[in-house]
């Protein structure tokens, strides 16, 4: 199975199934000298983990991360970083009825059609549980960005559940208020209504869709490449890879379809530092597929979860007959509240990858951070002076 990697220089490779022993990922391309905190990664994993509230799945996973390679004395060494998260509450028995009877609108049939087999416990690799790896990798990316010379800030919040939409909020509102309620919406009044909508659908044995607004500040201009490596095309790949996502837009998004060119065009002016900057930001910080230096923003939308305890019609390919099934596992009635850290993680991974590719961050080690050894060439040093070679060799032997 291909497609388990994301990124070019900052590269995440993941493994694990929903009801297997563990989830895990390897992150390569992290510069040496980054002070990496397992606790900071855990904070984001705690925001994503199940069982947080009555509107999330009741699966009891602590999602504790263990870093098992790539760091020494709290700092990255430049080698691949390995992270493992154990599955503690897997219950595959409830999925046995679906071994030969695919659940509607899941990956059960399509995985079987492609590979001739599949891990049927909880959907295996197709489960959204796999995003726990993405959040762990994103936690690494965030720390690299925070310790770089750029003040990159990333934040997201739930902007819609069902028909309830949040009012306008600022970046500061998201930083201060999005974690104050279980919906993760920075608009407190809308959050209460969203909570009621999710709760009502859950009581009815149903589910509902929603959307997340994201914003990234501090990204320099010049990231991205024309055409197939443009910033939005790579960011779109990241967001569409998230399970159940069915729409991604940046800038004013779909509003651009009804906006006149004279209104959508952004003129240029000099900012207070004398740098060219667009007037306005309907383009979401991107022009010609390359970043302008303005905030990058947009929305990601989810369809309603399709694992619901209502009777559904399917077929049994073993008996060749139709069959009624009920999905009785533990599932979320709405996805965006737990997906906020997933969106932030994939945005962080994308931004860091582009900054490494563009040379904005040293891919070997963070600039300005002293290494353990001085690697500069000094002609007068013993190892480069033939007359001192014997003395130097004796010193090594004595050690």
UniProtKB/Swiss-Prot annotation:
Record-listed E.C. numbers? 4.2.3.5
* Note accompanying the cofactor annotation: Reduced FMN (FMNH(2)).
**UniProt cross-references to InterPro entries, sorted A to Z:** Chorismate_synth (IPR000453), Chorismate_synth_AroC_sf (IPR035904), Chorismate_synthase_CS (IPR020541)
One GO cellular component from the entry? Answer: cytosol
Q: Which GO terms describe its molecular function?
A: chorismate synthase activity; FMN binding
- Which coenzyme or cofactor does it need? FMNH2
List the residue ranges of the region (Disordered): 41-72, 363-399
Residue span of the signal peptide, if any?
Answer: none
Q: Where is the composition biased (Basic and acidic residues)?
A: 363-377, 389-399
Residues reported to bind FMN: 125-127, 288, 303-307, 330
What keywords tag this UniProt record? Amino-acid biosynthesis, Aromatic amino acid biosynthesis, FAD, Flavoprotein, FMN, Lyase, NADP
Q: Which domain of life is it from?
A: Archaea
Recorded catalytic activity of this chain's protein: 5-O-(1-carboxyvinyl)-3-phosphoshikimate = chorismate + phosphate
Residues annotated to bind NADP(+): 48
User: What biological-process GO terms show up in the record?
Assistant: amino acid biosynthetic process; aromatic amino acid family biosynthetic process; chorismate biosynthetic process
Q: In which pathway does it act?
A: Metabolic intermediate biosynthesis; chorismate biosynthesis; chorismate from D-erythrose 4-phosphate and phosphoenolpyruvate: step 7/7
State the function annotated in the UniProt record.
This reaction introduces a second double bond into the aromatic ring system.
Q: Which family does it belong to?
A: Belongs to the chorismate synthase family.
Query: Mind telling me which PANTHER family this protein's record contains?
Result: CHORISMATE SYNTHASE
What is the name of the protein in this document? Answer: Chorismate synthase
Q: Can you name the source organism?
A: Haloarcula marismortui (strain ATCC 43049 / DSM 3752 / JCM 8966 / VKM B-1809) (Halobacterium marismortui)
Q: Which gene encodes it?
A: aroC
């Amino acid at each position: 199975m291909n497609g388990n990697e994301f990124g070019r220089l900052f590269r995440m490779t993941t493994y694990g199934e929903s009801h297997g022993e563990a989830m895990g990922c390897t992150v390569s391309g992290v510069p040496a000298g980054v002070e990496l905190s397992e606790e900071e990664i855990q904070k984001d994993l705690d925001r994503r983990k199940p069982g947080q509230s009555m509107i999330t799945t009741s699966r009891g996973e602590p999602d504790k991360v263990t870093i098992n390679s790539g760091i020494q004395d709290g700092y990255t060494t430049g080698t691949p970083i390995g992270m493992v998260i154990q599955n503690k509450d897997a219950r595959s028995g409830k999925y046995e009825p679906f071994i030969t009877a695919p659940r509607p609108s899941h990956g059960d049939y399509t995985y079987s059609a492609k590979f001739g087999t599949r891990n049927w416990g909880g959907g295996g690799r197709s489960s959204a549980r796999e995003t726990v790896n993405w959040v762990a990798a994103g936690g690494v990316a965030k720390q690299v960005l925070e310790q770089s010379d750029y003040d990159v800030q990333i934040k997201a919040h739930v902007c819609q559940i069902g028909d309830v939409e949040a009012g306008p909020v600022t970046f500061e509102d998201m930083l201060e208020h999005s974690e104050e309620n279980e919906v993760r919406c920075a608009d407190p009044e809308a959050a209460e209504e969203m909570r009621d909508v999710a709760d009502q659908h859950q009581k009815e044995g149903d589910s509902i869709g929603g959307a997340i607004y994201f914003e990234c500040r501090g990204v320099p201009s010049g990231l991205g490449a024309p055409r197939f490596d443009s910033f939005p095309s790579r960011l779109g790949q990241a967001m569409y890879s998230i399970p159940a996502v069915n729409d991604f837009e940046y800038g004013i998004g779909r509003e651009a379809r009804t906006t006149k060119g004279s209104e959508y065009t952004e003129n240029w002016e000099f900012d207070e530092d004398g740098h060219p900057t667009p007037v306005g930001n309907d383009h979401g910080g991107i022009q010609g597929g390359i970043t302008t230096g303005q905030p990058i923003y947009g929305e990601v939308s989810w369809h309603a979860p399709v694992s619901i305890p209502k009777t559904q019609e399917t077929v049994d390919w073993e008996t060749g007959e139709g069959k009624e099934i009920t999905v009785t596992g533990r599932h979320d009635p709405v996805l965006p509240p737990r997906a906020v850290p997933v969106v932030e993680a994939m945005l962080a991974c994308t931004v860091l990858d582009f900054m490494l590719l563009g040379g904005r961050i040293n891919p070997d080690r963070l600039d300005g951070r002293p290494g353990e050894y001085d690697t500069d060439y000094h002609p007068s040093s013993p190892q480069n002076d033939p007359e001192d070679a014997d003395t130097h060799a004796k010193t090594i032997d004595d050690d």
